[in-house]
Amino acid sequence: MLDASISPVVLVILDGWGYRNATEGNAIRTAETPIMDALWEAYPSTLIHTSGKDVGLPDGQMGNSEVGHLNLGAGRIVPQELVRITDAVEDGSILENPALLQACSAVRQHGSKLHLIGLCSDGGVHAHLDHLGGLLKLAAAQGIQDVYIHAITDGRDTNPTEGVNCITKIERLIATAGVGQIVTICGRYFAMDRDRRWDRVRKAYELLTIDGEGCGQTATEVLQETYAKGVSDEFVEPTRLAPGAIAPGDGVIFFNFRPDRARQLTYAFVEAEFEGFERDLIQPLTFVTFTQYDANLNVPVAFEPQNLTNILGEVVANHGLRQFRTAETEKYPHVTYFFNGGIEEPFPGEDRELIPSPMVATYDRAPKMSAQAVTDAAIAAIDKGIYSLVVINYANPDMVGHTGKMGATVEAIETVDRCLGRLVSAINRAGGTALITADHGNAEYMWDENGEPWTAHTTNLVPFIVVEGERRKLPGFGTEIPLREDGRLSDIAPTILQLLGLPQPVEMTGRSMIEPAAYEVKQGRTPVKVGV
């Protein structure tokens, strides 16, 4: 029989599983979810905040997976890069940023071109048009006239055809700054892959590096023609609009602030031993990234990472306890790199297992994704009886929800619900406790008030459930565990530390979701059994 000290606390992150009462357009309410429904009714449950100022974003800004996992792991509200960079644009300090000035200096030295690459979107998840506006003002202030914009269209964190409005906004930014020209346009499907689908990235890279006269159309015309074919912004074919390829001596600023979908294209430009596809390394090239995409990349970084200390994984490791993280490819960086505050290397005693995501064009074609295998990995880790903390992410609600396909998203939700039943049974067998939550909303809002597909995240609250185990009980509580009703993601790490009996460090400013006990234990509590 396993010792009680190694009955685990298991954090289950249902990525994109938001709460919304209305059934219309709600894949979660439409789906059959007997396990989640039973857990919600049988165990202490509440709703928590995952957006805006509650996670370090501007008020009203939807959350995302990176932000969510940062807050989950840090146990404090983490000021996000979106806010940091927007502040720099608004207070003018972006005009004095050393890394950005380095790119401008190289362009002046070589009499060359400045290229601005990034997601042209107001979604605020990977980039923001306000930041592009700041870069155009910087170029103008530095006297650089040859400024070429390589626009990556969104359609995933925004409405599927919002790109045409974003192009109009860029044209206004260009007019205001007096410099800049959109020379290429490309959907994020190609330029921002993160699953090593190098055939996609190669198309984007070749668009940026092989010159030509262009297609004779404006960006707006290309998008309108794309929409007429029933294709959204995410899948816009890489298209050259005008001359202006990246060449030796040029300067490049990649203005995405979120690393995970900017890495692969960056590797193609800067790695000498790049193996994704054949290409000649462009040298010299001053390539600046807005944030640190990879600690091993030797490139100037405009906004260096924040140093987060005494985060959850670190505290667990410092007390000599072992932990396990697992997710499929699409969310693996989130339960590792982002959950650990932007640190790539695991902490001592932290084991990880990556489950490959299915190789399909879009996940509506495989809505089950790799949820079964992720569940198997988590159960195997729990059964070992050596881990005090297990963190698991189910990608399906978010990744399939992003496709805008209702039927597929319902299947994704039902798949996760079945897996959750198996997982909770394993946790109960081990005497552990499960904390079930989500990092942001998505699948609960599949189309807008006009009946158009909604493929972005939401600002809706998400569930939080404590499935208390037989050997991970909280001392001082009776038959019920009272939960706070004003919680946020940063409160979950302190809750985990309380369950593990570990002290909360002063840097961790979140508050446990569990209200102080009002009475003494009067009877035993046995986990409620749910069907699997």
UniProtKB/Swiss-Prot annotation:
Cofactor note text: Binds 2 manganese ions per subunit.
Molecular function per GO: manganese ion binding; phosphoglycerate mutase activity
Entry cofactors: Mn(2+)
GO biological process entries: glucose catabolic process; glycolytic process
Annotated metabolic or biological route of this protein: Carbohydrate degradation; glycolysis; pyruvate from D-glyceraldehyde 3-phosphate: step 3/5
Binding site for substrate: 126, 156-157, 188, 194, 258-261, 331
Residue numbers annotated as active site: 65
Signal peptide feature range: none
GO CC terms in record: cytosol
Gene3D superfamilies: Alkaline Phosphatase, subunit A, BPG-independent phosphoglycerate mutase, domain B
Residues where Mn(2+) 2 binds: 15, 65, 439-440
PANTHER family: 2,3-BISPHOSPHOGLYCERATE-INDEPENDENT PHOSPHOGLYCERATE MUTASE
Family: Belongs to the BPG-independent phosphoglycerate mutase family.
Quaternary structure, from the entry: Monomer.
Described purpose of this protein according to its UniProt entry: Catalyzes the interconversion of 2-phosphoglycerate and 3-phosphoglycerate.
Full protein name: 2,3-bisphosphoglycerate-independent phosphoglycerate mutase
Gene encoding the protein: gpmI
